[in-house]
Amino acid sequence: MDLIRTVEGLREQGQLGPTAGAFGAPDEVLLLSTGPASHLAKYSMIARPPRRRAVVRQPQPETSVLDQSNPLQAEPAWDTEGELTATVQAWSDGSWHDLQQVSAPTLDDLMRTLNDVMLDQQPFVTHVEGWPQRPFLSGAFAYDLVQWTQPIRVQHVPDFDALLAVFWSVDGALLIDHASGQSHRLHVNGDAWAEHVEPAEARVTLGPVVQHAALESSMDDAKHAEAIESVK
């Protein structure tokens, strides 16, 4: 199945992106597997338009203290950051609205909390091997989250309120099996998006252009010049 054509088709049908307001936000959550199909790159995922997300931003810095450490001389500064805070939002009336804030001392603790706060416990109607059986989180992370994943003090932190991560609640998706070319739908009972979404038709691929051999002239340059002179 042509993955890019499928994404384009969903957009054209109002099932994904800015035209999918009837189902959720314009955010597009795609997990793309490239390269040969294997157990490490078997599926690609196109999530249904999300209806809930959580945004994590760089907190206000504490009072700065001159750091005398020198990691290049085996003198790293060991430290633990404060609370990591996420703002849970819901899509409504054409925009994202803040619902609540949740905090945790580490990234994994925060994700467990978001799992309880954001996700519907209703199971998916269909089950696909290797995939969760109910809604799950998918996200995009900045490298600066190392402040909460490693016990080191970062000397040059991002600016206050810089975006660190976004977590989306995936309560429906179209899965594409690269080995078989088949598609599978993950959805909860009564999801109108899953009832209408249809994989796009295969893109027509033109065959290779046939290279014709160059035409050979029966007249060389000298004969061509003689012919011109004869006309004069």
Residue ranges with predicted function:
Residues 104-126, 150-161:
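Short acidic (Asp/Glu) patches
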Residues 128-141:
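C-terminal interaction segments
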Residues 121-130, 226-232:
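A short acidic-Thr-Gly-centered motif at the start of a beta-strand
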Residues 1-103, 140-232:
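Extended accessory regions or peripheral subdomains of proteins
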